[in-house]
Regions:
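Bacterial N-terminal signal peptides
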Residues: 9-18
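GH16 jelly-roll
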Residues: 29-259
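Positively charged n-region of N-terminal signal peptides that target proteins for export
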Residues: 1-4
Length: 259
């Protein structure tokens, strides 16, 4: 569906005035040096149909995370077609890895609120299609991951100071690689809720819901990130990756609403 090219940023009056005066890394484990010098911006509402690349809001990765991530991420593998962001995974070698794929992330970080994506996952054993939030060091992260070995399930996870191990796999009741669906993360002070197509699927909090009472929860502003990658050495988790041709993940829009 053709969509209007638009980015709406709703900010506080003080920030608007400032802008006007200046005008003229599940185990997704996204990434250390990829984060750079992003700024924490806590008052924006972000709505972006994925029609075209806006370097003022987003950047395309050009690096590799190494380890279990058996690809390099290159800018030309994150491109726009038919009103969607497309991440392509193929067997072009890059950054010392045998495969190349795409990773797309915001320049700024966002605090408590709801993060939403409308996406269609790639299908293929050994792969992960992701939507997640990430801080850099110290490492907090909240994940939505579709494992290509079974695209009728979704895996949720979170990290606090680099400690994960909170995976929860949920049956979707549909094939995430067959069409677009909405996945949302509600991130608050001491809690996280995950939704699919507007329906609550899983949640944790520090008051004893699916986590010990008093458990540490993510608390820092985070970048919004999406990527597609093949695994290596993690066959028991992802299944074995055997390349048989390019794979694609599609993203229709990303939305953030602050609390």
């Amino acid at each position: 569906m053709k969509r209007t090219v638009a980015i709406v940023l709703v900010v506080t009056l003080a920030l608007v005035a400032l802008l006007a005066s200046c005008s003229g890394n599940t185990a997704t484990e996204a990434a250390g040096e990829a984060i750079g010098v992003s700024r924490a911006v806590q008052n924006w509402s972000l709505w972006e149909p994925m029609n075209s690349f806006n370097s003022g809001v987003w950047n395309k990765a050009d690096w590799t995370n190494g380890g279990m991530f058996n690809c390099g991420w290159k800018p030309d593998h994150a491109y726009f077609s038919n009103g969607q962001l497309v991440l392509k995974l193929d067997n072009v070698s890059s950054h010392g890895r045998p495969y190349t794929s795409g990773e797309y992330r915001t320049n700024n970080t966002f605090s408590y609120g709801t993060f939403e994506v409308n996406m269609k996952a790639a299908r293929g054993s050994g792969t992960v299609t992701s939507f997640f939030t990430y801080t850099g060091s110290p490492w907090d992260e909240i994940d939505v991951e579709i494992l290509g070995k079974d695209t009728r399930k979704v895996q949720f996870n979170y990290y606090v100071n680099g400690v994960g191990g909170h995976e929860k796999v949920i049956d979707l009741g549909f094939d995430a690689a067959a069409g677009f669906h909405k996945y949302s993360i509600e991130y608050g002070n001491g809690y996280i809720n995950w939704y699919v197509d507007g329906q609550w699927k899983w949640g944790v909090n520090n008051n004893g819901m699916n986590a010990p009472k008093g458990a540490a929860m993510p608390s820092r502003p985070m970048q919004i990130m999406v990527n597609l990658w093949p695994g290596t050495g993690v066959d028991s988790w992802l299944g074995r990756f055997n390349y048989s041709g390019p794979l694609y993940a599609y993203y229709d829009y990303v939305k953030y609403t602050p609390k």
